[in-house]
Amino acid sequence: MILDYNKLKQETKAIVVDIIERSALKKGQIFVLGLSSSEVSGGLIGKNSSSEIGEIIVEVILKELHSRGIYLAVQGCEHVNRALVVEAELAERQQLEVVNVVPNLHAGGSGQVAAFKLMTSPVEVEEIVAHAGIDIGDTSIGMHIKRVQVPLIPISRELGGAHVTALASRPKLIGGARAGYTSDPIRKF
């Protein structure tokens, strides 16, 4: 599959802006990215990693999140136990467990390599509880999204050759029929 990188940038931006807006993210919250550049390029996950594709996607997403004051956490593959690259400032502020690994294309993946290159002071953390996220290429980001997870159907379900899904989160509804609830900015009730 031959990708048009300008189109990839435009489509990435459209998808991520859609998910940011519909997930009702606020300044200071965390957004997870799961990315298989192999899937984006039309291959199988983990088999055809592309640093170029990873950098394009992470750069676009970082720009959109940064302009809104939202933090990015980039999930790695199972070879790094799905650890995440975040800014050191976030890890310190949230008292996250920092782990020692430097990602490469086949241990961490192209998204993590790009995050290490593009972030100000990147570190790997063992786990995180994020408010929303996007999964490009069926990498399974659910373990990093807080409860209650709300699936969002992206404006486009594909990016290149990759399947795209997204999750937001909302507070638990407790109390049953007698309870009243505040409005839900995600589902609009």
Curated annotation (Swiss-Prot):
<dbReference type="Pfam" id="PF04260">
    <property type="entry name" value="DUF436"/>
</dbReference>
<protein>
    <recommendedName>
        <fullName>UPF0340 protein SAG0103</fullName>
    </recommendedName>
</protein>
<dbReference type="InterPro" id="IPR006340">
    <property type="entry name" value="DUF436"/>
</dbReference>
<comment type="similarity">
    <text>Belongs to the UPF0340 family.</text>
</comment>
<dbReference type="InterPro" id="IPR028345">
    <property type="entry name" value="Antibiotic_NAT-like"/>
</dbReference>
